[in-house]
UniProtKB/Swiss-Prot annotation:
Domain of life: Bacteria
Function comment: Catalyzes the reversible adenylation of nicotinate mononucleotide (NaMN) to nicotinic acid adenine dinucleotide (NaAD).
Cystine crosslinks: none
Biological process terms in GO annotation: NAD biosynthetic process
Keyword annotations from UniProtKB, A to Z: ATP-binding, NAD, Nucleotide-binding, Nucleotidyltransferase, Pyridine nucleotide biosynthesis, Transferase
Pathways involved: Cofactor biosynthesis; NAD(+) biosynthesis; deamido-NAD(+) from nicotinate D-ribonucleotide: step 1/1
The protein's name: Probable nicotinate-nucleotide adenylyltransferase
UniProt-listed Gene3D superfamilies: HUPs (3.40.50.620)
Family label: Belongs to the NadD family.
E.C. number(s) listed in UniProt: 2.7.7.18
MF (Gene Ontology): ATP binding; nicotinate-nucleotide adenylyltransferase activity
Main EC class the enzyme belongs to: transferase
Gene name tied to this protein: nadD
Amino acid sequence: MSKAQAVRRIGILGGTFDPVHIGHLRSALEVAELMGLDELRLLPNARPPHRDTPQVAAQDRLAMVREAVQGVACLSVDARELERDKPSYTIDTLESIRAELAGNDQLFLVLGWDAFCGLPAWHRWEELLQHCHILVLQRPDADVEPPDELRNLLAARSESDPTAMSGPAGNISFVWQTPLAVSATQIRQLLASGKSVRFLVPDAVLAYIEAHELYRAPN
């Protein structure tokens, strides 16, 4: 197979990244390395339909993610959802990305366990696997049970070894991640109370937060 015909392996990890933190980044890096991805794209959401409105502006969240991935070869940023003047539906993003790839390229949607369990509430969720494989990040402390719709889907589409998934799309597998007890909510609360978030976010992200006075409590 010539280099021009080589199958590309692309992952996407969406989120509000309000702000991006070491938990996001460590999960992204672990998935990229485990799966041998050519690229894992962090994809900031504009107005996610299933989440609260982000606390800071889209351009600030995008800038922080760009700062966070600088110098990490396998991680990149995809801003397409911020360029839409409507809610961010994952199916629209997958269709858009898939249209840019070759037919046999593999596309992996990376989801946390809680997000995966909430899939039946997503817009056109039954069509997701037409465009991608799904990698579910599992934590040892995950205690949410999947709904029946997902149990049936897992029975039909589950692959026990994530690295063995073949074809451009269609399967689901689980990836164990390093448990890091850090959340964007926790970081926002610390910043609002005037406490340090050093070592919870990359230094470049902390510098951006401080320079732009983000997440401070209102006077």
